[in-house]
C-alpha cells in the first residue's frame, strides 16, 4: 500500500537518543540490545569499522547518561555473509572467529558496559537454519545441525575466555528461549517425543554451557565433533543466564506432522505439535500466561 516497506522500520539508528529518553521517562533501568556484527567488522574478520564503533559508543553513552544499564548481545542471528560462505556455524573455524569478534567488542565497550550476552536463542538459529531451512542459511541437514550445536557452544566458551582475559570484572552469560514441553498423552511414544523435543529446544546449549555436558539423547550425535578439552572450554563459570519465554509446546510422536507453523524441525526428527483449540497470537503462538512458571 502506497509503496510502503519496512526498510526504515523504527529507525533506531538515527533516533536512538529520543528512544532512550522514552526509556528513561518510564523508569527503565536497563536496555538489552544486539550488536550487528557487520556494523563492527563488515567482513566478519579483519578490519574494524570505526563508524560502527562510534554509533554503539554514542548509544552506550546515552544509556549511561540516563542511568540505564546497557546489556550487550553479541550475536542475534545476523552472520556476515563472508563467514557463511566459509560454512557458517557448521565450520569449526567459527569458534575462533567469534572469539576474536567478542574481543573487539570488549576492547571498545568493556570500559563502560558490564554485561555481555554471547548468543541470543541459539536453539532458534541452529534448528531453523540447519534443520527445517526456514531461516538463514536455509539448510535441511542434520549433520550440519549437530556440528553447529557444538561449534556455537564452543564459540561461547572461547568468547568467554577472550572477554574475561581483557576485563575480568564484566559479567557474561547466554540467553535461551526456554519452553515447557507437555506430552499430548501419557503414551510411551509421546513421552519419548517430548523428551526429544526438550533436548533439542531447551537443553542442547544450556546443559553444555551451564552443566558441562550434553544431554544424554544428544551426545551420540555431537560426539564426532568434540575434540580434546572442548567440554572444558565450553563449561565456563557463567555469571548469569538469560531466559526468553513465548509459549509452551504440546508434543506428540509424529514423523510427518512437523512444527511448520509454530515451531521447528522436519520429518527427520520424530515429533510434532498437538493442535489445540486455544487462543493464539498473530504469530501462531499459544497464549499460556502461566507457562513461564
What is each stretch, according to the model?
Residues 1, 24, 43-45, 54-293:
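Active-site region of glycoside hydrolase catalytic domains
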Residues 1-49, 53, 59-65:
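N-terminal structural segment of carbohydrate-active enzymes
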